[in-house]
UniProtKB/Swiss-Prot annotation:
UniProt topology in membrane: Single-pass membrane protein
Family matches, as InterPro entries: CCDC90-like (IPR024461)
Name used for this protein in its record: Uncharacterized CCDC90 family protein C3H1.08c, mitochondrial
Annotated GO biological process: calcium import into the mitochondrion; mitochondrial cytochrome c oxidase assembly
Localization per record: Mitochondrion; Membrane
One GO cellular component term: mitochondrial inner membrane
Pfam families, alphabetized: CCDC90-like
Family listed: Belongs to the CCDC90 family.
Organism: Schizosaccharomyces pombe (strain 972 / ATCC 24843)
Keywords: Coiled coil, Membrane, Mitochondrion, Transit peptide, Transmembrane, Transmembrane helix
Residues passing through the membrane, by range: 191-211
Coiled-coil parts of chain: 105-143
Amino acid sequence: MIIRKQIFPFLSQNRPWTIINRIQSERYSASYEPSPELLKQSSRRLEQAGYSVKNAETITNLMRTITGEALTELEKNIGFKAKQESVSFQQKRTFLQIRKYLETIEENEFDKVRKSSDKLINEIEKTKSSLREDVKTALSEVRLNLNLEKGRMKDAATSRNTNIHENETKILNEVDILHKEINDMKIQTNQWFTGFVGVVSSVVLIILFYF
């Protein structure tokens, strides 16, 4: 619709058919009129050829009329041909202008499409770059969290191992202490039992001695 609105006003200003109608409706008139001297010379030649003065003048006037009509027709044909050539030239010029205008519009539309495509490609590239950066950032955060979690787990395992070792050491120490205490108790018990046996033996010996 835009192209038609822009082209049709141009054509309305240069309508070739209006020129043709104007040419066809024009009335051409003879622009050729022989000089009086030439007419007199023609009459004298006819008189010398044997024609009377009246007949010579009649023939001269007739020839003048015929020549004028012939020249008028020739002038009309030449003018019509010139007008046709002018109309054809105007049509060619109009078509060339239309073609140039359409090519310009096509180039402009192509430029617009190309610019839009370039803009879309740039936006896509920016989006890709942004997504890459986001993915890299997310992966970095995940790796960092994993490393931190691994570190925490390692620290926790180390702490547990340390606690276990400390507990084992404490238990071994307690066992050693308990073992020493048991040994001491055995020694004390043996000493007490030995003393008790000695006392009982002494008592028995005394009883046997007196009784």
